[in-house]
Regions:
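Extended recognition patches within non-cytosolic domains
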Residues: 248-252, 304-314, 421-459, 468-470, ...
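Solvent-exposed strand-to-loop "edge" motifs in beta-rich extracellular domains
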Residues: 359-362, 463-466, 543-549
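Extracellular glycan-recognition modules
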Residues: 182-195, 321, 328-339, 351-353, ...
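Short, solvent-exposed beta-strand-to-loop segments that form ligand-recognition rims
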Residues: 370-398
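Sequence context surrounding c-type heme c attachment/ligation sites in exported
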Residues: 178-179, 183-299, 861, 873
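Primarily short, surface-exposed interaction patches in extracytoplasmic proteins
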Residues: 45-79, 84, 89-119, 134-187, ...
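Extracellular carbohydrate-recognition regions
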Residues: 172, 320, 324-327, 445, ...
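Extracellular glycan-interaction patches encoded by glycine-rich segments
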Residues: 335-338, 344, 390-423, 429-432
Length: 968
């Protein structure tokens, strides 16, 4: 029948949108009507269907006068099923095993094998963790660690691998602690460790320190919204402040659902928990071998830390010997260019000897950043404007910083990390006159973060070595140069604007009282800000307490005169912050490679307590309040007007959404028959109702999620919203049939996977030119072909590692910390970072094990739309951006793995370039190259210099191909 185009389009719209149908029994609309048995429709083409799914798909296609696409090639199918079920491409041997099996059962056997593969759980747990808003930190200010959240991630992986019935999976996460029967008058039955870990689901929302009723209201509201959207596919959270704008969910129903969680409480914070995020509950390791694994891991961590400490001690001794021989510095003016007009001197440093240098600064402005000084008391500094001296002290207490004469001067603080305080400020050459003292009345010190000069030079070297060092060519004016030799000092020279730096400014006039001088010495500690002025010749001396840290202070002198500055060898004072040397400019005496090695060892030691804490048998779970006489009874739940915690309305009792039940009567809650635990069983009642086969939503929602994750789009396009905004299902009867299949097969998710991937619908090709179908159904709602889609971010990273041969396939365990890009790694290195960068195999496990820090998403994964969830995420965005190309071609991660991929090919294919290219295609794309592809990549490899990098370049091209990044 040839229908006019407009009529044909209208017919398609009527078929595809499948407007919401009514249930004749009680006039409730889909999806609130019960799931009932559905008859599989007859097939217009009996040869095409492989199972019931295909009958429903073919019925809609036939009505729209469309036909399904041909089956995909075996090479496409084997790659598709591997990436779909385990998130990794097949090896050439695995692909060949399937391609060479011509039996009718080859596909079904492969599907069963992959569903039994432990990598299946690692792949599919990622989708559930997005729903559960999983993260390893709590978010908000400080983003505190949730040290035991990783156990929930392993619980999900293990549950999926064991094909735990989905109804049990629901009950454990909502009320795992309430399903033990109360058999007598004894103690309350304890929940098992697996159930305690499972209830981490309720705890995973971003959480700040509790603020009484407000925090509790927000916590319970978030739990209510998440449970409703994840398990029921309802946006109940939209009714928190007012009746739902689109669905029949009144505000009253939101708080009736919230009442099921009214007895939830968070464990008390652990001792020393400055963030007050709440503690953990005991939960022994329960999986086979997990207890032994934890003990072995503790021993490994301790052994690694002990080895790192011994190596650090050896390195420090070696560096002290290198650094401690000589010390000195040079000064050079900023003019039209660098010339040899610096003044330089040096002296032997012996057990803390001090080095002093002087330079003329007539008409120039200099900025001195003084660092690595504990303190040194020098005695009088009076004397000429030029000269040098040194002292030998074992335990310096404070330091003299500066002399100027014949002009005005200003002193600027260049940093604010001074842990102690200024103890004294002196005018040292002569007793202060009354006039001089009148100019020193205001003494305050304003703390500021260091802001280095915007132009100038920073020298950490003997200046005479600068010209001889080929790594420090003469820069243009206004640029900075830094270097190290075996002579340690520190100075920044700059023509700076004083406004660019935190200030200890010259202040004239009257000022607030409170600090005074008695003779030569300051009486009392300085307040927050220190400013002073003198117009007379003499030595300005600032005396620090011994708590001065390595960050340093800067002092600036402008105008006519001279300035004297003193430095002390940083190692001679025996400072505990010797490690801070690595935070300075690159060293030539201590190479960059040595610095990196030292930093890695220091991190091993620093992160040990963090990892050991994670290995305690605990879970980031919730608990129920025990009620009288131990704790308060069941709180009264009230509607909160406009969602405001302090604006109570009517009292409500726990109950299910009236749009589903048809009434708003309270739920039946099976209370303790001995009346000792009045707070118990509320969440159990909710979990039992959600997990019941009679619930019209639960099975439909999870069946739709699996369909969405297999095809890229659900039968209901909005997986967590089955309400009116979803526009209903495209194949209503099919979704009901899938839901019925799930419940009849003991809620087995693997049985539903098996049903979907064994269908002819799933096995269609994605590359099918059908202009008529493309015009009629451009979004492929009727599934006349398979949907081509890009791999998720985690699958991209895992596939790159798998193809290079470097993927660590160890299952379960602590979070991992892969290397970050250099700019981000430098930024987090000197903060209170939680990122313990792992450069070895432990950092190359699958992406599901990566530490999920809410304030630090891995840039490579973020580029491919990965998220660290603050809320439940039912689906990922799939963007196409230039950044993805750059990440796959220029990132250090892909570059390294391309080199290893090329080496893997060389090892297996020999030295022949043609054979190497052919094998690279088999490994990356599961097929042989076409003649044109073979020719192009061989030409690229041959033209690349050096010659050994040719195959590396070819492998990088394969990583960047759409075929590698997409599932066909």
């Amino acid at each position: 029948m040839n229908l006019p185009a407009k009529l044909q389009m209208l017919l398609f719209l009527l078929v595809a949108t499948a407007a919401l149908g009514h249930c004749p029994a009680d006039d409730r609309i889909w999806p609130y009507n019960p799931v009932e048995s559905i008859q599989v429709p007859p097939a217009s083409d009996p040869a095409w269907p492989r199972n019931g799914i295909d009958h429903f798909i073919l019925e809609k296609l036939s009505t729209a006068e469309l036909s399904p696409a041909p089956q995909a090639t075996p090479e496409q199918l084997v790659r598709r099923i591997y990436l779909d079920l385990i998130g990794l491409p097949p090896t050439p041997a695995e692909a060949d095993a399937f391609l060479s099996d011509s039996s009718e059962s080859a596909w079904e056997s492969l599907v069963n094998r992959l569903l039994d593969d432990p990598r299946y759980g690692e792949r599919w747990a990622r989708f559930w963790l997005d729903l559960a808003r999983y993260a390893d930190t709590a978010g908000y200010e400080g983003d505190p660690d949730l040290p035991h959240a990783w156990r929930y991630r392993d619980y999900v992986i293990d549950s999926l691998n064991r094909d735990k019935p989905f109804d049990l999976f629901i009950r454990e996460q909502i009320a795992g602690d309430e399903f033990a029967e109360i058999m007598g008058a004894g103690d309350l039955p304890a929940a098992g460790p697996e159930e305690i870990v499972a209830m981490t689901f309720l705890r995973l929302a971003p959480f700040t320190e509790p603020r009484g009723d407000e925090s509790r209201h927000e916590l319970l509201s978030e739990i209510t919204s998440t449970v409703s959207s994840v398990f029921l596919g309802l946006t109940v959270g939209c009714a928190k402040c007012h009746d739902h704008k689109y669905d029949d969910i009144p505000t009253r129903d939101f708080y009736r659902l919230q009442a099921f969680f009214s007895t939830v409480s968070i464990p008390r914070p652990e001792p020393g928990d400055g963030f007050q995020i709440g503690g953990s509950l005991p939960a022994e390791f329960y999986r086979d071998g997990e207890l032994d694994w934890a003990a072995q891991k503790r021993a490994q961590l301790q052994q690694a830390a002990d080895g790192a400490e011994a190596e650090l001690t050896r390195i420090r001794a070696d560096w002290q010997q290198r650094i401690g021989g000589m010390a000195g510095f040079g000064l050079q003016a900023m003019g039209d260019g660098l010339s040899n007009n610096y003044i330089y001197s040096r002296s032997t440093v012996n057990d803390g000897a001090l080095h002093t240098a002087i330079t003329n600064c007539d008409g120039k402005q200099w900025s001195f950043i003084i660092d690595q000084v504990t303190a040194l008391e020098t005695g009088s500094n009076a004397g000429s404007n030029q000269g040098q001296w040194f002292a030998d002290l074992k335990s310096p207490q404070h330091v003299s910083l500066g002399q100027y004469s014949q002009g005005s001067g200003r002193i600027h603080s260049a940093d604010a990390h001074h842990l102690g305080e200024f103890a004294q400020i002196l005018i040292y050459d002569h007793p202060l006159t009354l006039e001089e003292q009148s100019h020193l009345h205001e003494l305050t010190a304003r703390p500021n973060t260091a802001q280095p000069p915007q132009s100038g030079l920073q020298f950490w070297l003997d200046a005479s070595d600068l010209d001889a060092d080929p790594s420090t060519p003469n820069p243009a004016p206004g640029t900075a140069v830094a270097a190290w030799t075996d002579r340690i000092a520190g100075i920044t020279i700059s023509q700076t604007d004083p406004q660019l730096q935190p200030s200890l400014s010259v202040i004239a006039g009257t000022a607030l009282p409170g600090v005074r001088f008695a003779g030569d010495f300051l009486v009392g500690a300085l307040p927050e800000r220190t400013s002073f002025l003198t117009q007379n010749s003499g030595s300005l001396v600032v005396v620090f307490t011994a708590r001065h840290t390595h960050e340093g202070y800067g002092f600036e002198v402008g105008g006519d005169g001279s300035f004297l500055s003193t430095f002390i060898n940083p190692t001679a004072a025996g400072r505990e912050d010797f490690d801070a040397l690595l935070g300075q400019t690159p060293l030539s005496v201590i190479s960059q490679q040595e610095r990196d090695h030292f930093s890695q060892l220091s991190a091993r030691r620093r992160f040990l307590p963090q990892h050991l804490n994670r290995l305690q048998p605990l879970a980031m779970s919730l608990r129920h309040s025990y009620g009288p006489p131990y704790e308060p009874g069941v709180p009264v739940t009230r509607v909160r007007i406009r969602g405001e915690y302090d604006n109570p309305g009517e009292i409500v009792e726990a109950g299910f959404p009236s749009v589903i039940t048809g009434h708003d009567q309270p739920a039946e809650i099976r209370l303790d028959p001995f009346k000792r635990w009045p707070t118990r069983s509320r969440r159990m009642a909710l979990a039992s109702w959600i997990a019941s086969p009679k619930n019209p939503l639960t099975a439909r929602v999870i069946a739709n999620r699996l369909w969405h994750w297999h095809f890229g789009r659900g039968i209901v396009a909005t997986p967590s919203d089955f309400g009116s905004l979803s526009n209903g299902p495209s194949h209503e009867e099919l979704l009901d049939w899938l839901a019925m299949q799930l419940t009849q097969n003991n809620w087995s998710l693997k049985s539903l996977h098996r049903l979907i991937v064994n269908s002819a619908t799933y096995r269609q090709t994605s590359v099918h030119l059908n202009a008529h179908a493309a015009e009629l159904d451009p979004d492929n709602l009727l599934l006349w072909r398979f949907n081509r889609r890009r791999l998720e971010a985690e699958a991209v990273r895992d596939s790159v590692l798998h193809v290079s041969g470097r993927l660590n396939e160890e299952h379960f365990g602590l979070p991992i910390f892969p290397p970050l890009p250099n700019d981000i790694a430098e930024r987090v290195k000197y903060t209170d970072s939680k990122w313990d960068t792992q450069y070895g195999p432990e950092g190359r496990k699958r992406s599901i094990y990566i530490y999920q820090q809410r304030t630090l998403n891995m840039p490579f994964l973020q580029t491919f739309d990965a998220v660290v969830c603050d809320e439940s995420r039912p689906r990922r965005q799939h963007s196409v951006t230039p950044l993805q190309i750059l990440a796959m071609y220029n990132s250090e991660f892909v570059s390294q793995e391309a080199e290893h991929f090329a080496q893997r090919v060389r090892d297996q294919a020999g030295s022949g370039l043609a054979e190497q290219i052919a094998l690279a295609f088999q490994i990356a794309l599961c097929r042989s190259p076409r003649p044109s592809e073979q020719e192009q990549l061989q030409a690229l490899a041959a033209a690349t210099q050096p010659q050994t990098a040719g195959l590396d370049a070819a492998c990088r091209v394969l990583f960047n191909s759409s075929e590698f990044l997409y599932v066909d």
